Curated annotation (Swiss-Prot):
Catalysis performed (reactions): N-terminal N-formyl-L-methionyl-[peptide] + H2O = N-terminal L-methionyl-[peptide] + formate
HAMAP family recorded: Pep_deformylase (MF_00163)
Keyword Metal-binding assigned: yes
Top-level class of the enzyme under EC nomenclature: hydrolase
Protein name (database record): Peptide deformylase
Species of provenance: Brachyspira hyodysenteriae (strain ATCC 49526 / WA1)
Residues that hold Fe cation according to the record: 96, 138, 142
Length: 187
């Protein structure tokens, strides 16, 4: 089922997500919904908080840019945690489904190790590098209440200030309208 994206300005994006204690049908359905939503929105990664669910859950589907015949690297990570990273960073342009049309360069580690649970509840360790490592860091940040704009340098934030303010104001106005409709319905 398609889910609605949470957009910048919504306070949920700044909250730390809760650890998933039990992998049940509800979590498995959530994973499927996240993949469906991510594909529809043409993303390569999605954290549960981006659809309003404050659970430590991330899905990714990353193409192999060197071999278009290869299938995408597709993975659901439950309770993901970066347990190691190298010291080398690379700055590449990032965007985010929760920040429509806003992009900028973000420095990320080029190699990481991620501990997570798979769909069956088995603990896994993933060695990731380059683009996959970048996508994972971006999505795991979301589970910790961190958005890619929090990783920007101050000069980058100043450059994007107007666009971010407009996006936040539009989101806040939309949330207020929904809340007002809910209050009217319940009175």
């Amino acid at each position: 089922m398609l889910r609605e994206l949470v957009i910048y300005g919504d306070e949920r994006l700044q909250k730390v997500s809760e650890k998933i204690e039990k992998i049940d049908d509800e979590i498995l359905t959530l994973i499927d919904d996240m993949f469906e939503t991510m594909y529809k929105e043409r993303g390569v990664g999605l954290a549960a908080v981006q659809i309003g669910v404050l659970k430590r859950l991330v899905v990714i589907s990353v193409p192999d840019f060197d071999d278009e015949e290869k299938p995408d690297f597709k993975l659901a990570l439950i309770n993901p945690e970066i347990i190691w990273h190298n010291d080398e960073t690379e700055s590449l342009e990032e965007g985010c489904l929760s920040f429509p049309e806003i992009r900028d360069d973000v420095a990320r580690y080029t190699q990481i190790k991620v501990k997570y649970l798979d769909r069956e509840g088995n603990e896994q360790i993933l060695d990731a590098e380059n683009y996959i490592a970048k996508v994972l860091q971006h999505e795991i940040d979301h589970t910790n209440g961190i958005s890619f704009i929090d990783r920007l340098e101050s000069y980058q934030k100043r450059r994007l200030k107007r666009e971010l303010k407009e996006l936040r104001n539009n989101t806040v106005r939309g949330i207020k309208k929904v809340n007002n409709r809910e209050m009217l319905k319940n009175s």
